[in-house]
Amino acid sequence: MMESEVDSEQSRLKREIAELRAALNRKEQCLRELEASVSSDASAEEQVVGNALESPGRAVHTKLTNDDIARYSRQLILPDFGVQGQLKLKNSSVLIVGLGGLGCPAAQYLAAAGCGRLGLIDYDEVERSNFHRQILHSESRCGMSKAESARIALLELNPHCEIHCHSRLLYSQNALHIIRGYDVVLDCSDNVPTRYLLSDACVMLRKPLVSGSALKMDGQLTVYNYGNGPCYRCIYPVPPPPEAVTNCGDGGVLGAVTGTIGAMQALEAIKVIVGLGDVLAGRLLIFDGSSGLFRNIRIRSKRPNCHVCSAQPLITELIDYEMFCGMHATDKDNPLQLLSTDERLSVKDYHAKLQAQPHLLIDVRPTAEFEICQLPEAVNVPLVEILDDSYLKRFGKQLEDKELPIILLCRRGNDSQIAVQHVRNRFPMHSVRDLIGGLHAWTNSVDPSFPIY
C-alpha cells in the first residue's frame, strides 16, 4: 500500500473513531441524566405523569364553576361545544413537546381554552433569537428553561390550568413513562428523530398525535394514530438523509407562520378531546403563507405492513432514534462529516496562517444571509450557484492559478462541505478546503464581536 494511501486510511479510521467516541459520549450523558432523574425525583415524576389509572385520587370535574362560566362563555355558547365540551376540556391532559414557535401558541390557546392539565417538554433555554416566534418567552427570562418560562406565562393567562414542566430531552428511556399520563400529544419539535420517537410511543400507548411543522413561509399539519388514520411511519417508513433535512434554524421561518400552525394544532387537540368536527386524520393541511392559501390533501391510509402500527408489528419497543435517523434529536448545530481532516481548516489556523496570504474565500450562504454579516475578504457565491457551476465565469482568471488556495465557508460548516466536494471534483489540482464550524466557530474562537444568528 502506498504511503499516501496509508495516511488516508489512518485519517479515515481516526475520524470514524472520533465520531464513535462523540456518539458514545452523547449516550453516556443521556444515561447520566436518566439515572439522575430517576434517583432524585422519581416520586415527583409519578405525580407529574400519573393518569387516572396511576393517580386514582385525581378529581373528575362534573360541573363548571361560576368563574369557568364567565371565563369560557364565548365558547360555551357554541351549540356543538357547550357545557359538556368544556367539562371534557377541564378533565383532559395534553402533552406539548417543544416550547418553540409551534409549542408556544399551541400551549397558549389550550391553556386559554380551559385544558385541565398541560405537560411541557423542552430541554432548551430561552435566547434572543426565539422572541420573534416563541411568544410565551420574554427578555426578562433569557437563560431560563423554556418549559419553566412557558409555565410562568401560561399561569398568568389562566391560573386554573395545572401545568407540569419536563425540562429535559425526550429519549427512548423516558418517553413512554412521560407520555402515558396524557390524553393527547402535540409534536411541536423541529427534528426527525423526535418525530419518529413520538409517533412510535403514541402508537404503543394508543395516544393521538397532533403533528405540526413550519419552515420559511410554509406550514403543515396532520393528526397521526387517530381512528383508522396512519402513523408517521406509515407515511415515512425510512428517514431522509441528514443532509436533506432543513430546520427553521437553517432555512428560516416567519413567526406568524409558526403561530398559524401552532394555533391550529391547539384546535385539532380540542377537536380530538371534545369530539368536535372532522379531525385531520388521514389528511394533511398545507399552508402557503406567501399566497395565504390553505390546501387539504388526502394522505395514504394505514400501511398494512407498517413496522409499528400494523396488526403484527416488528417494532414493539422504542429504539435509538438518533442512530436510526443518523442525526441528533435536537435543533442545535448538527454538524455533518462529509470531508476528511485534510480537506478542512480550523478558523484559528485560517486566522493565524492563511488570512494574510493570497487566497480565494467564498461564502456559500444565501445572499440574504450574506447581507446580515460577512468577513471582509469573503465573496458571496450561494451554494446553488456552486452546484450549477454558474460561478466559473466570475472567477475564471483566479481559478487558472492552481497555487491559489480556495477556502469555502458558510454559517455552521455544513453547506461548505458540500461545496468543497463539488469544487474539488471540478478542480482536482487546486487546494480546496472549508472552515470547520463556519461563522459560528469564527465568533466563538476568533472574534467574539462578530454577530451570530
Curated annotation (Swiss-Prot):
Active site (record annotation): 248 (glycyl thioester intermediate), 410 (cysteine persulfide intermediate)
| Pathway participation | tRNA modification; 5-methoxycarbonylmethyl-2-thiouridine-tRNA biosynthesis; Cofactor biosynthesis; molybdopterin biosynthesis
Q: Which Gene3D superfamilies match?
A: NAD(P)-binding Rossmann-like Domain (3.40.50.720), Rhodanese-like domain (3.40.250.10)
Transmembrane annotation, as ranges: none
What PROSITE patterns does its record include?
RHODANESE_3
Q: Which residues bind Zn(2+)?
A: 231, 234, 306, 309
List UniProt keywords, sorted A-Z: ATP-binding, Cytoplasm, Metal-binding, Molybdenum cofactor biosynthesis, Multifunctional enzyme, Nucleotide-binding, Nucleotidyltransferase, Phosphoprotein, Transferase, tRNA processing, Zinc
Annotated EC: 2.7.7.80, 2.8.1.11
Reactions that this protein is recorded to catalyse: [molybdopterin-synthase sulfur-carrier protein]-C-terminal Gly-Gly + ATP + H(+) = [molybdopterin-synthase sulfur-carrier protein]-C-terminal Gly-Gly-AMP + diphosphate; [molybdopterin-synthase sulfur-carrier protein]-C-terminal Gly-Gly-AMP + S-sulfanyl-L-cysteinyl-[cysteine desulfurase] + AH2 = [molybdopterin-synthase sulfur-carrier protein]-C-terminal-Gly-aminoethanethioate + L-cysteinyl-[cysteine desulfurase] + A + AMP + 2 H(+)
Q: What does this protein do?
A: Plays a central role in 2-thiolation of mcm(5)S(2)U at tRNA wobble positions of cytosolic tRNA(Lys), tRNA(Glu) and tRNA(Gln). Also essential during biosynthesis of the molybdenum cofactor. Acts by mediating the C-terminal thiocarboxylation of sulfur carriers URM1 and MOCS2A. Its N-terminus first activates URM1 and MOCS2A as acyl-adenylates (-COAMP), then the persulfide sulfur on the catalytic cysteine is transferred to URM1 and MOCS2A to form thiocarboxylation (-COSH) of their C-terminus.
UniProt record similarity statement: In the N-terminal section; belongs to the HesA/MoeB/ThiF family. UBA4 subfamily.
Q: Which NCBIfam families match?
A: PRK05690.1 (NF004281)
* Protein name, UniProt field: Adenylyltransferase and sulfurtransferase MOCS3
The species this protein belongs to is Drosophila yakuba (Fruit fly)
Record lineage: Eukaryota, Metazoa, Ecdysozoa, Arthropoda, Hexapoda
